[in-house]
Amino acid sequence: MITNDIDKLSPDDFSIIFIATGGVERLVIQHFESLPRPAILLADGMQNSLAAALEISSWLRGRGMKSEILHGELPETIKRIFVLHSNFVAQRSLFGMRIGVMGTPSSWLVASNVDYLLAKRRWGIEYTDISLDRIYEYTDR
């Protein structure tokens, strides 16, 4: 994709950034705000593309952005792309959904709390607390 077209991507587009050559690192990071998240970088190993992808990935991760480099044997790379696409489709299908949370974790469970805001940011999911009293009302009918 030509960098002028990067703004035409929507969150519903599954995107892979093909790093065809070295020397494009600065160009990619100039478009940091427009990059798909997570950033999937495809390097073919020619023209210093792998080195450039590693440099870009390191820069992105240093700024808290997830990235993955696809590189290696073609059949495995293709399989990985299919997995990433399936994950993308599944994640997009969750966007806008509401999940009812019944009850709360016991106080002795120190790692079982759900960060509602983080889930909304990552997946577009809204959690709604449902009291157990409300559940009992429906089951007593």
What does each model-found stretch correspond to?
Residues M1-R141:
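An N-terminal assembly and electron-transfer interface module characteristic of large anaerobic redox
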